[in-house]
Amino acid sequence: MHEQAIRVRPAEPADHPAIRDILRTAYRQYTRDIPPAVWGPYLTDLLDLDRHAHHGQLLVAVVDEAIVGYAAFYPDASVQGFGWPAGWAGGRGLAVDPTFRGHGVAMTLLTALEDRARAAGAVVFAFHTSAFMTTAVALYERLGYCRAPRFDVDVNAHYGVPAARPWPALAYLRRLTARPAARNAA
């Protein structure tokens, strides 16, 4: 169906409306899982692309010039305010247009994030997700990411919103090594 090549590029300000649409659409499925008192601050934070761009780089996945995915890259994950150590890189807000799910967009974005982390000299690439984001958790574990409970975050407390239900953000990380050089077929 979507057999076109996926490429990742830095986002431009003109891309922000499309990115926000993808974020709203991709995260809408979690409105029942996220405590209602926290949903508003969480979505506002995800959609604050200017702040994410100020501290990192916004990336978009593109197929035939259409934006089909997004992720924010933080060369210094400690600036995110989630307790990551200095020297680690981080990601935030990974989202894929639902019509392009299952076609490698998330994996392509993760590869681009890891490549940027290596280029920045980071020894670890880290991010948070939630247990109810089961498809994402399965992808991360399949790719070799490890749980790091020491860095889990209480999202309700992070946003300063008391909620009846707890919402832990689960920390995942991957220790980075040099990417193997491509082999030439002889």
Language model features: what each stretch is:
Residues 13-16, 21-98, 110-112, 116, ...:
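Acetyl-CoA-dependent GNAT
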